[in-house]
Amino acid sequence: LSGLARKIADDPELELQIIATNMHLSPEFGLTYREIERQGFRINRKVEMLLSSDTANATGKSVGLATIGFSDAYEDLAPDMLLVLGDRYEILAAVTAALFYKIPVAHLHGGEVTEGAYDDAIRHAITKMSHLHFTSTEEYRRRVIQLGEQPERVFHVGAIGIDNIRHIDLLDKKVLEEQLDFPFDRKTVLVTYHPETLDAIPTGEQFRNLLEALDDRQDIRI
């Protein structure tokens, strides 16, 4: 959101207010709110919500804490509109609180699908509490409309992350090898894992299955 935030901040007719929350405020995850400040933005409010546990009980409590924190923030900041992106549970808390304050919500990246995860339910709930919708593809625009949103309020604008890619200074291979201490001397594969949060199989077991499959590929560096 940094590029869009910059455009809002530079517009003389608009006032940007930033609320930082969740992992941005956690030492365990690097206190990344500092990255926001290093880009020259002022954080107007920090909403503490993250409990140091990944259980269902802790996550539910974190959502409750976030809803309280965002309510307090809206009471003080009195925003005219809330701009949110995606399907994180802290965003669900933010728009839930905004609903009762009658704050219009602009939602980016609605209508998308993440199979096997809580994300779909959260994302669609955010859509139903939002007033303006900016989707990354025409297919997702149609899905938002299928959820009952007014077509004239749903806009296919593309993925906002593309703007960031266009402005990134890419590292060359040698510099990247030095920074990662990882030689690219043969075919290399970057592997990421997104757990299926709705699956009855524990996440650890799912991940072990992935590692076992990768063990069979001795011809590549992972």
Where are these regions (language model features)?
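Short internal beta-strands
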Residues: 16-22, 133-134, 221-222
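A conserved nucleotide-sugar
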Residues: 13-15, 211-222
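A nucleotide-sugar donor-handling region in carbohydrate enzymes
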Residues: 24-27, 130-205
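Active-site and donor-binding regions of nucleotide-sugar-utilizing enzymes
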Residues: 1-9, 49-151
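Short hydrophobic segments within beta-strands
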Residues: 19-21, 108, 192
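Conserved nucleotide-sugar phosphate-binding/catalytic loop shared by glycosyltransferases and other
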Residues: 14-62, 69
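Charged helix-capping and loop-helix junction motifs
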Residues: 119-121, 173, 203-211
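PLP-dependent amino-acid enzyme catalytic core
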Residues: 11, 45, 57-64, 68, ...
